């Protein structure tokens, strides 16, 4: 799930932190990809008539189709991926996982009902909500990656946290995930939409954490506190606290401790903190997650030549893929993994740090930009209100 409304908050308050571009812009870079999030998106997106793609024996193959062709696209654009798989979830996440399971069970019932009496759109909607990544999906994807010559790592717990470790250590350029909480784990750069299909024509979003903090005028602790307040996988959000309120509370009080204190001492009792709300434990999971250090042997990875006959045996003989397509894909993979050995020039240069004066100027310009945006929104809201209040037919 990640952090609710975080991307919206960044867009509105730190727009310079986000850079949209084409996949080819990342040629020559190594990227750590959140495998479980990618597999989930493959299961949801790679479908036929609202159903999972399946082999002749009734086995789901959407995850393998997605992993094979999306990885091929990434490699053909000169990127060297390393996939990171989730381990056991932290205990604090068990509540959120239980809720997700309940939602999927309810969706499964609604899906069956929709098949009986609903529209095609209803069937598709509820079918998507029942999607769950299983251990078997993960193991089959690991087998496929090994045959493709693409490395993978098993994280002790959260894949995003392990991706962030690799990015901070410079082993990869960025962490790639749709989960915004990757930034809470201190990944310097987050890439979104990297494993999306080409048909979706979504730009790759590159989010820089240092620019996020600069735009929000927060340190990392305040940023993590904001994310917890927005709503994360570890805790229920505080009822009635939306993104604008969460941002204001952190800016006014500076920390979650002081926010909680202010809410509890408010005589009007405007907000109610959930009874079991261990925000300090959640913060600790972001600051000290269970991860392997970048120099751990399990974090040493390399790209190999694909095992073409192994791919044919697995995908064609066992999963009924087209042999011509698999062999063609393997040949393209072999060719492009060699090409991706090239380095980017940026690896030889260090960015020049901004002076205090430059930082102050940028901050002032950013604040002026925000004020203009707020003014424009107010004017639009006012015009909308006036238009509604006019009698029908009035000019």
From Swiss-Prot:
GO terms for molecular function: 5'-3' exonuclease activity; 5'-flap endonuclease activity; DNA binding; magnesium ion binding. Its cofactor is Mg(2+). Residues 357-389 have a biased composition (Basic and acidic residues). It is found in: Nucleus, Nucleolus; Nucleus, Nucleoplasm; Mitochondrion. One of its GO terms (biological process) is DNA replication, removal of RNA primer. Its EC number is 3.1.-.-. Structure-specific nuclease with 5'-flap endonuclease and 5'-3' exonuclease activities involved in DNA replication and repair. During DNA replication, cleaves the 5'-overhanging flap structure that is generated by displacement synthesis when DNA polymerase encounters the 5'-end of a downstream Okazaki fragment. It enters the flap from the 5'-end and then tracks to cleave the flap base, leaving a nick for ligation. Also involved in the long patch base excision repair (LP-BER) pathway, by cleaving within the apurinic/apyrimidinic (AP) site-terminated flap. This is Flap endonuclease 1. It comes from Blastomyces gilchristii (strain SLH14081) (Blastomyces dermatitidis). The gene is FEN1.
């Amino acid at each position: 799930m990640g952090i609710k409304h975080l991307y919206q908050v960044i867009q509105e308050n730190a727009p310079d932190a986000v850079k949209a571009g084409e996949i080819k812009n990342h040629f020559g870079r190594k990227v750590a990809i959140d495998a479980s999030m990618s597999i989930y998106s493959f299961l949801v997106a790679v479908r036929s008539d609202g159903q999972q793609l399946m082999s002749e024996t009734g086995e789901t193959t959407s995850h393998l189709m997605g992993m094979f062709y999306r990885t091929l696209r990434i490699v053909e654009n000169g990127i060297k991926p390393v996939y990171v798989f989730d381990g056991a979830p932290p205990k604090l996440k068990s509540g959120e996982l239980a809720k997700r399971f309940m939602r999927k069970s309810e969706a499964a019932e609604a899906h069956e009902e929709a098949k009986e009496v609903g529209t095609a759109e209803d069937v598709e909607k509820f079918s998507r909500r029942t999607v769950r990544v299983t251990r078997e999906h993960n193991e089959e994807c690991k087998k496929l990656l090994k045959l493709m010559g693409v490395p993978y790592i098993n994280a002790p717990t959260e894949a995003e946290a392990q991706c962030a470790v690799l990015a901070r250590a410079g082993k990869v350029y960025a962490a790639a995930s749709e989960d915004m909480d990757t930034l809470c784990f201190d990944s310097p750069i987050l890439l979104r939409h990297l494993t999306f299909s080409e048909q979706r024509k979504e730009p790759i979003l590159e989010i820089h954490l240092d620019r996020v903090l600069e735009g929000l005028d927060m340190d990392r602790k305040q940023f993590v506190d904001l994310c917890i307040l927005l709503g994360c996988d570890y805790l229920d959000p505080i009822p009635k606290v939306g993104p604008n309120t969460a941002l204001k509370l952190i800016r006014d009080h500076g920390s979650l401790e002081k926010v909680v204190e202010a809410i509890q001492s408010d005589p009007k009792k405007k907000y109610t903190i959930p009874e079991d709300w261990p925000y300090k434990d959640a913060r600790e999971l972001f600051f000290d997650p269970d991860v392997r250090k970048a120099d751990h042997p399990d974090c040493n990875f390399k790209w190999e030549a694909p095992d073409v006959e192994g791919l044919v045996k697995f995908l064609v003989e066992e999963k009924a893929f087209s042999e011509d397509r698999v062999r063609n894909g393997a040949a393209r993979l072999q060719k492009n993994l060699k090409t991706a050995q090239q380095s980017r020039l940026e690896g030889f240069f260090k960015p020049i740090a901004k002076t205090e004066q430059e930082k102050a100027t940028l901050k002032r310009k950013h604040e002026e930009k925000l004020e203009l945006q707020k003014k424009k929104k107010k004017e639009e809201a006012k015009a909308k209100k006036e238009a509604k209040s006019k009698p029908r037919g009035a000019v």
